């Protein structure tokens, strides 16, 4: 892909017109192609007729229906055989209907095969026969079938009719079908060709110069047909004038195609970049696939390798475990024999210890029960005494509360009666209606009170006169009774105290001696008190006796313990040692033996500790090496990969560093070569850009200056020179080959001073650009150069250069060479860029290796040292295992010696006790004395407090207080009399208080109100007293109830405690023991000692029993373990054998596929199975996603998940490698290893990305360049239109004296051009946006600068493509100069018919000439196309107009076919008279041809 100028300006020059006469003189003269004849076969009226066509004008003259239109229709059909276009409107023959698909052609044919054939002669002198075969198709639609064909290499003397027909007899002929025609020329020099498409047919006609334009599409055919149709029917065709730009202005397909190619290249470039991104993602996917598959398979591979190694190790361990179990079983059998013997001895001594322990335990329980009973008795005695005191106190308090309650009850009753009486009085007073009634009521109440007092006192004669005397008497009696009550109360209190003392003393006697008669209580008390001092003295001696007994029992116990220990020692030592000397000597022997064993064991332990330290050191070294080993293996893998990438073998780190320096040097050299090639490529691109300029201008400023001066570059004038002439003209002009040809140098001179930017040397030549003469210099060819005389004194000699700027052909030839060199340079640059990136990547790998692995890569293999350490460690382990048995024996002997020494240490201090033989008798005697003292102590403890209380009050037992009940009854009677007397006193006092009421009998009415008030006050006072009495009664009642409840609870508690006390005393009597303070402790000590001995004995027995059971169980387990170990060993060995088969298959697959190196990653061998499984599982999850779209790999991956077949994983890895190998582009990447391919792919993709990015910058075109191209193209077309106008200057038809074309630039598009060239920075946001194509940016700019224009629903891409067509920037109009109106727009309504026909013909001639110029580059250089137009109904033209047409045809070397009625008689050309005749019922057209008959 070249630069922008090569894209957009290479085809602009196709529209240049050869106007310089010196250029034409340099090119050999080429004659124009001509139509020679028209042949119609089997048409309506023409069975076989050939019309020879004149070189200028051929006229068909005849009346209506003579066949003129049919002849022209045959010509048009042979020229354009397209049924979609053919439409002969002016025909009236039968068969032409509006619904017929032949559009008037069906009726012009006869049944059978028909032909319309054109014979022409091109510029090369070749005879070309082309035409169509027509045939009617039966049916209502009246279709016509058309087949086009051509013939070449036909002899000149052979007519067309003889070719298409075959004579049958003397007077008949047969029309040949196409197949017959083809068979006729098979094997001959004649080239017959039938065309299956109209495009191929027209391409043939164009290539041989029959038609002026290559008709590629139906649109081109439609234009050509409309041009023929317009010329046929005459006049100004509105179809052509409305789209005059499409006809006159050539479609600059080169520029549009160049723009499309540029956009397509940019789009392709960007798509390639996107594809590179996709490829990079694919590369990442490949990289991920190979990485994850390697992790997936290698982790499983190493896990199986570790498992296989572990299985072998386990098999060895199982075998060792089997042998160890056997040795353990033998040792346990020996231990079982020893423990069984000791067990028998322990069973014999256990029974005696159990009996002693049970006896001591029973004695302790008895003592503890006695102590607990004694404690309970003492506690209950204290509780009973306390409760008795509290009961007496509560009884006295209850009696006081009962008295207070009775008094409160009496006061409450009296207050209640008084309130009721006052209420009744008040009720009576309230019922009275007046004061008299009230007093009467009071009087009545007084009378009632008197009657009540009489009843209470029993005095019938009581009245107001003696009430005071009786009241005084009753008060005295009440005082007397009160004194008596007080006296009785005192006597009752004293009597109560005496009774309580007697009762208490009696209770104490009964408590001590049991139930006793009240009369004998005094004698029993004296007996108890007389024996009390002696019992108390005996009780005090119990403590000393108890201590003495304790000491004796302890010595006895020590003696028994010593005897037991001595017996146990003799049993264990298997000796009969009894005296102290033997024991001491034996002790010294055992002490010396113990020291020897301890020294030997310490030395042994020290040696074993040293071995363990060595083992720990070896383990640490092994661990360090194990930690270093993965990194070392990783470094080795990296080193191997680096050696593969470098193609070198490194022996040391210095070699790596040296190679790294060499790589850096190679990178610098390759970088210099790459940069040099890049500069060379840039120079070649610039040269290509200059050669791609349409006019050969090497400096863009020359084009701008030529446009500014209104001139033309001289190289543009010589654009069409041949390759042979280009060196001559280039040498002729020398440095002036880039000169500008201007019309007037003086006019340009004034503008030179205002130039800001121009080349260093600017050459200007005066001359007419449209008719430039090369006689500027006097020159003469001299050998391989030319001598140019610049002046009389200055000549210049220039040699013919190999490459000349002049001429498009020369530049194109040089452009091909430069492009070839550029392509070669580009390829070399790509290779060097790849080498640079390869060196950079290699240097990066080296740097990464140096930074990460260099420190470990060249160190020795840690696994070798690990194997040596493992051997040493195994030897130490063997020694430690052997030493373990020896140490166990030493420790067993040491424990036996220590146990004997411990027993001796216990026995030796007690040898003196063993000699005391009277110890047992003294213990028994002291125990009897202690029992007597304990009985007295128990009696004193039980009844000592009672005797102490009885001693001061024992005198009260002498007299029994039996009169207490009589005194209590008298006291109660006196209290009743006191109450009755108080009621009498109260009744008499009430009468005395009412004495005033008795006087109300007569004077009631005067004092009622005061009495009522007095009653109310009394009632209020009485109610308050009643409430107080009630409250006091409630309080007294509550207090009495509370005291009564307390008394009841105390009495219940006293009874319960007393009963329990009696029961406890009875139980103590039943036990028959008396406790002292140390009895329980001694019994417990004795019991604990025996319990400890028994416990130790049982513990030892239990231990021995357990040991026996453990040994038996251990032996059972060992038997099972031996069998299991043997079974496990054989099972493990089978596993090893089976795993070996599978492993051999895996190794075979990996080695045959050359993937073992990838899978055997030793750095993974030091990870656990779980870690490896985790790596494999993670990789499996990633692989499931990666191969989801690949059914083959997906199935293989699914099969590889079977853990029973590890070889499937290797198969999957091999398939992945094959899959990646198949996707390696061998033309790009020269390797079979996918990993190396990924590395090279990264380098290649990086290089392509850089190259495409720079290529995109080169492909981009600036808006200013587009504006210049469009402006230059528009200027050239304007110049061409100007030249076309010059050919129409002398045309005159009627009043029309001239015809011209007017071309203008549209205002909206002119604004767009200005914006493209002048406002680049302002609109850079559009053209620098990579998301927009150039066409879309151009459309958006057009909308931005012309916001008033509505673009409709078209897309920006479509609008932009239209704006790249310069024709859309121009408006074309046809103007005529007619009479006094001057120049005006050509319209049919403003012209006569003849004027319109002539004007239209002039326009059509311009179109044909424009088409020729447009297609000049697509034709051969030695061919000029034929020019032919039609004119039907030429009778509209006068003779002058006809002559004008003849002149126009002669001047433009054009042929004209005219159809005119009989009154038309042209003076020149060939005229055919057509007359339709009927002979023998056969219709035919009689044709007579004449040349120039008008002048005859």
From Swiss-Prot:
UniProt KW Cytoplasm keyword: yes
Coiled coil, from the record: 326-492, 534-632, 863-942, 1005-1171, 1235-1291
Keywords: ATP-binding, Cell cycle, Cell division, Chromosome partition, Coiled coil, Cytoplasm, DNA condensation, DNA-binding, Nucleotide-binding
Example of a GO MF term: DNA binding
Gene Ontology cellular-component annotations: cytoplasm; nucleoid
Family: Belongs to the SMC family. MukB subfamily.
Quaternary data: Homodimerization via its hinge domain. Binds to DNA via its C-terminal region. Interacts, and probably forms a ternary complex, with MukE and MukF via its C-terminal region. The complex formation is stimulated by calcium or magnesium. Interacts with tubulin-related protein FtsZ.
The protein's name in its UniProt record: Chromosome partition protein MukB
Top-level taxonomy: Bacteria, Pseudomonadati, Pseudomonadota, Gammaproteobacteria, Pasteurellales
Gene encoding the protein: mukB
């Amino acid at each position: 892909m070249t630069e922008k100028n090569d894209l957009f300006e290479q085809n602009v020059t196709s529209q240049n017109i050869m106007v310089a006469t010196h250029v034409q003189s340099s090119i050999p003269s080429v004659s124009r192609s001509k139509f020679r004849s028209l042949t119609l076969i089997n048409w309506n009226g023409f069975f076989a007729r050939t019309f020879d066509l004149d070189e200028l004008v051929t006229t068909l003259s005849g009346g209506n229906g003579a066949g003129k239109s049919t002849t022209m229709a045959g010509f048009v059909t042979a020229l354009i055989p397209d049924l979609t276009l053919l439409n002969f409107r002016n025909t009236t023959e039968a068969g032409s209907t509006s619904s017929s698909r032949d559009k008037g052609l069906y009726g012009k044919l006869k049944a059978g095969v028909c032909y319309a054939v054109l014979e022409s002669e091109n510029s090369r002198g070749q005879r070309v026969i082309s035409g169509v075969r027509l045939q009617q198709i039966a049916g209502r639609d009246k279709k016509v079938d058309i087949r086009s064909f051509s013939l070449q290499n036909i002899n000149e003397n052979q007519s067309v009719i003889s070719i298409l027909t075959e004579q049958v007899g003397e007077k008949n002929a047969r029309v040949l079908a196409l197949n017959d025609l083809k068979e006729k020329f098979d094997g001959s020099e004649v080239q017959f060709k039938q065309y299956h498409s109209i495009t191929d047919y027209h391409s043939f006609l164009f290539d041989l110069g029959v038609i002026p334009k290559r008709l590629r599409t139906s649109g081109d055919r439609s234009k050509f047909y409309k041009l023929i149709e317009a010329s046929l029917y005459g006049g100004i065709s509105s179809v052509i004038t409305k789209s005059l730009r499409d006809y006159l202005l050539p479609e600059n397909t080169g520029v549009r195609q160049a723009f499309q190619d540029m956009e397509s290249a940019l789009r392709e470039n960007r798509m390639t970049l996107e594809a590179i991104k996709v490829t990079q993602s694919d590369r990442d996917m490949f990289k991920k696939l190979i990485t994850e598959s390697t992790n997936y398979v290698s982790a499983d591979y190493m896990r199986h390798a570790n498992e296989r190694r572990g299985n072998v190790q386990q098999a060895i361990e199982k075998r060792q475990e089997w042998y160890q179990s056997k040795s353990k079983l033998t040792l346990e059998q020996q231990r079982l024999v020893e423990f069984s013997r000791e067990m028998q001895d322990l069973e014999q001594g256990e029974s005696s210890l159990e009996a002693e322990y049970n006896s001591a335990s029973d004695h302790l329980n008895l003592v503890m029960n006695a102590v607990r009973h004694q404690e309970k008795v003492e506690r209950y005695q204290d509780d009973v005494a306390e409760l008795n005191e509290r009961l007496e106190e509560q009884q006295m308090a209850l009696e006081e509360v009962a008295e207070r309650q009775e008094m409160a009850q009496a006061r409450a009753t009296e207050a209640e009666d008084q309130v009721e009486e006052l209420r009744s009085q008040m009720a009576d007073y309230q019922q009275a209606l007046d004061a008299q009634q009230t007093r009467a009521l009071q009087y009545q109440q007084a009378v009632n009170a008197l009657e009540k007092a009489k009843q209470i006192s029993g005095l019938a004669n009581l009245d107001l006169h003696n009430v005071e005397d009786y009241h005084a008497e009753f008060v005295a009696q009440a005082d007397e009774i009160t004194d008596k009550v007080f006296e009785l109360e005192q006597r009752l209190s004293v009597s109560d105290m005496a009774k309580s003392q007697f009762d208490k003393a009696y209770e104490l006697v009964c408590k001590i001696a049991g139930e006793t008669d009240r009369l004998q209580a005094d004698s029993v008390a004296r007996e108890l008190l007389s024996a009390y001092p002696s019992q108390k003295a005996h009780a005090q001696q119990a403590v000393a006796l108890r201590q003495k007994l304790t000491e004796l029992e302890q010595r006895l116990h020590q003696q028994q313990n010593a005897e037991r220990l001595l017996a146990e020692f003799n049993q264990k030592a298997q000796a009969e040692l009894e005296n102290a000397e033997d024991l001491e000597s034996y002790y010294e022997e055992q002490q010396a033996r113990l020291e020897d064993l301890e020294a030997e064991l310490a030395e042994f332990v020290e040696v074993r500790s040293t071995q363990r330290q060595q083992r720990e050191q070896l383990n640490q070294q092994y661990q360090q090496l194990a930690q270093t080993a993965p990194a070392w293996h990783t470094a080795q893998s990296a080193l191997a990969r680096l050696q593969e990438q470098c193609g070198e073998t490194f022996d040391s780190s210095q070699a790596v560093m040296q190679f790294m320096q060499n790589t850096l040097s190679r990178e610098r050299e390759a970088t210099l070569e790459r940069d040099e090639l890049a500069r060379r490529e840039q120079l070649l691109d610039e040269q290509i850009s200059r050669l791609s300029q349409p006019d050969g201008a090497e400096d863009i400023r020359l084009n701008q200056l030529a446009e500014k001066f209104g001139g033309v570059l001289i190289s543009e004038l010589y654009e069409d020179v041949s390759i042979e002439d280009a060196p001559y003209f280039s040498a002729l002009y020398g440095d002036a080959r880039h000169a500008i040809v201007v019309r007037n140098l003086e006019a340009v001179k004034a503008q030179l001073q205002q130039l800001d930017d121009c080349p260093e040397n600017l050459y200007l030549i005066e001359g007419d650009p449209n008719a430039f003469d090369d006689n500027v210099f006097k020159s003469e060819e001299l050998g391989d150069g030319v001598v140019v005389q610049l002046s009389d004194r200055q000549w210049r000699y220039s040699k013919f250069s190999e490459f000349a700027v002049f001429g498009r052909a020369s530049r194109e030839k040089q452009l091909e060479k430069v492009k070839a060199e550029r392509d070669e340079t580009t390829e070399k640059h790509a290779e060097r860029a790849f080498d640079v990136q390869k060196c950079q990547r290699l240097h990066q790998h080296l740097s990464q290796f140096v930074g990460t692995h260099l420190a470990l890569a060249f160190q020795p293999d840690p696994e070798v040292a690990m194997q040596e350490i493992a051997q040493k460690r195994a030897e130490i382990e063997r020694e430690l295992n052997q030493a373990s048995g020896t140490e166990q024996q030493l420790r067993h002997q040491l424990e036996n010696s220590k146990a004997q020494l411990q027993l001796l240490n216990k026995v030796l201090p007690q040898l003196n006790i063993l000699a005391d033989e009277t110890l047992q008798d003294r213990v028994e005697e002291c125990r009897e004395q202690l029992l007597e003292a304990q009985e007295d102590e128990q009696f004193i403890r039980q009844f000592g407090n009672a005797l102490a209380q009885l001693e001061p009050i024992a005198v009260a037992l002498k007299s029994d207080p039996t009169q207490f009940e009589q005194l209590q009854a008298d006291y109660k009677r006196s209290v009743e009399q006191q109450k009755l007397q108080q009621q009498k006193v109260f009744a008499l006092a009430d009468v005395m208080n009412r004495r005033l009421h008795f006087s109300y009998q007569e004077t009631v009415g005067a004092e009622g109100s005061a009495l009522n008030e007095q009653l109310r006050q009394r009632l209020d006072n009485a109610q308050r007293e009643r409430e107080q009495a009630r409250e006091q009664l409630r309080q007294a009642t509550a207090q009495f109830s509370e005291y009564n409840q307390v008394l009841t609870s105390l009495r219940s508690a006293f009874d319960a405690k007393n009963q329990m006390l009696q029961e406890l005393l009875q139980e103590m009597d039943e036990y028959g023991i008396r406790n002292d303070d140390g009895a329980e402790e001694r019994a417990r000590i004795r019991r604990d000692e025996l319990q400890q001995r028994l416990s130790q004995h049982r513990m030892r027995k239990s231990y021995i029993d357990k040991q026996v059971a453990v040994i038996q169980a251990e032996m059972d387990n060992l038997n099972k373990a031996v069998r299991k170990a043997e079974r496990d060993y054989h099972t493990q060995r089978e596993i090893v054998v089976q795993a070996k088969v599978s492993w051999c298959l895996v190794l075979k697959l990996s080695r045959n596929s050359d993937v073992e190196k990838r899978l055997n990653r030793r750095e993974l061998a030091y990870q656990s199975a779980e870690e490896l499984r985790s790596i494999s599982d993670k990789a499996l999850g990633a692989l499931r996603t990666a191969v989801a779209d690949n059914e083959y790999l997906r199935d293989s991956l699914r099969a590889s998940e079977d853990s029973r077949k590890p070889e499937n994983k290797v198969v999957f890895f091999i398939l992945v490698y094959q899959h990646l190998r198949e996707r390696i582009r061998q033309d790009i990447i020269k390797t079979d290893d996918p990993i190396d391919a990924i590395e090279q792919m990264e380098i290649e993709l990086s290089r392509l990305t850089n190259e495409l990015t720079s290529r995109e910058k080169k492909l981009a075109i600036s808006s200013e360049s587009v504006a210049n191209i469009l402006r230059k193209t528009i200027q050239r077309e304007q110049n061409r239109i100007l030249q076309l106008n010059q050919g129409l200057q002398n045309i005159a038809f009627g009043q029309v004296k001239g015809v011209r074309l007017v071309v203008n630039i549209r205002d909206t598009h002119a604004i767009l051009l200005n914006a493209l060239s002048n406002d680049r920075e302002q609109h850079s946001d559009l053209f620098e946006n990579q998301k927009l194509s150039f066409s879309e940016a151009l459309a958006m700019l057009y909308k931005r600068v012309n916001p008033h224009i509505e673009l409709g629903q078209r897309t920006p891409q479509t609008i932009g493509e239209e704006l790249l067509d310069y024709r859309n920037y121009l408006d074309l109009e046809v103007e005529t100069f007619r009479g006094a109106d001057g120049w005006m727009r050509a319209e049919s309504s403003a012209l006569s018919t003849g004027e319109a026909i002539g004007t239209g013909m002039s326009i059509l001639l311009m179109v044909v000439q424009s088409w020729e110029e447009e297609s000049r580059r697509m034709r051969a250089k030695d061919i000029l196309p034929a020019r032919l137009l039609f004119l039907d109904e030429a009778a509209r033209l006068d003779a002058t107009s006809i002559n004008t047409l003849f002149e126009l045809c002669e001047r433009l070397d054009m042929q004209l076919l005219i159809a005119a009625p009989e009154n038309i008689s042209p003076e020149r050309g060939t005229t055919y008279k057509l007359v339709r005749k009927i002979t023998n019922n056969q219709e035919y057209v009689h044709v007579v041809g004449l040349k120039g008959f008008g002048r005859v």
